[in-house]
């Protein structure tokens, strides 16, 4: 069928099916690649505020512009930031809507994340999210990778600048972020870039040895039981006291 669609799930298990379809259908033309994977649940401000009230946490509301500026400053200051926004991602990769975001310039940030939250093997790398227009400055390849399925070599002169997302072999499994695909996450990274000169953040999934959080309640629960510093859920911010 000429109008077939094989959606990516930001993982490897669907690649064989996609390749098989392409092999068996040489007449496929005008292929359009899915640039985002934001097809999951989304929650209203009212639903989010209701969960925050039920939790008893102190929170503050931010405008969308104030939200990204404040979060970017927190990241630049070394905070571990929970970032819960918009529709949940489809698949096992956090792509900026159910993410924990930190500063990639700190070489100790991998250990901090593993100690406070992830509790995983120290050799496992963490992923960079980078503004799409800056990919060539930091990586040897420039092809878009919006669903974190590509591993590129980090340019040798940039490895010391972003050590927390540079694997021991000099590679990084990156996510390229464009304003068209995820405008809020793009703005967050842009604000971090403005503060630090680095258009990259470390992005890992918002969870602790459980499935990625889906709802505001799950995000709040994960924040409470880990040593995350700040939680941004929708336009609301919660700071650990």
Regions found by a protein language model. Give the residues of each.
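Flexible beta->alpha loop and helix N-cap segments adjacent to enzyme active/binding sites
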Residues: 1-3, 11-14, 18, 22-241
């Amino acid at each position: 069928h000429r109008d077939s669609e094989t959606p990516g799930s930001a993982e490897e298990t669907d690649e064989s099916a996609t390749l098989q379809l392409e092999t068996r259908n040489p007449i496929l033309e005008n292929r359009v690649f899915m640039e985002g994977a934001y097809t999951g649940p989304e929650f209203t401000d009212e639903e989010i505020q209701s969960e925050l009230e039920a939790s008893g946490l102190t929170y503050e509301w931010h405008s969308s512009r104030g939200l990204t500026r404040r979060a970017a400053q927190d990241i630049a200051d070394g905070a571990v930031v929970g970032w819960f926004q918009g529709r949940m991602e489809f698949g096992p990769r956090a792509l900026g809507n159910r993410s924990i975001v930190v500063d990639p310039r700190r070489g100790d940030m991998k250990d901090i994340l593993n100690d406070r939250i992830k509790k995983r093997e120290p050799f496992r790398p963490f992923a960079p999210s980078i503004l799409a227009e800056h990919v060539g400055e930091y990586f040897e390849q420039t092809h878009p990778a919006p669903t974190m399925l590509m591993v590129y070599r980090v340019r040798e002169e940039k490895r010391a600048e972003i050590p927390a997302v540079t694997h021991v072999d000099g590679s990084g499994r990156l996510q390229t972020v464009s304003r068209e695909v995820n405008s809020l996450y793009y703005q967050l990274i842009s604000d971090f870039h403005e503060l630090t000169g680095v258009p990259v953040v470390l992005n890992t999934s918002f969870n602790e040895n459980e499935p990625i959080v889906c709802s505001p309640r799950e995000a709040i629960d994960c924040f409470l039981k880990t040593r995350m510093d700040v939680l941004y859920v929708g336009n609301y911010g919660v700071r650990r006291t």
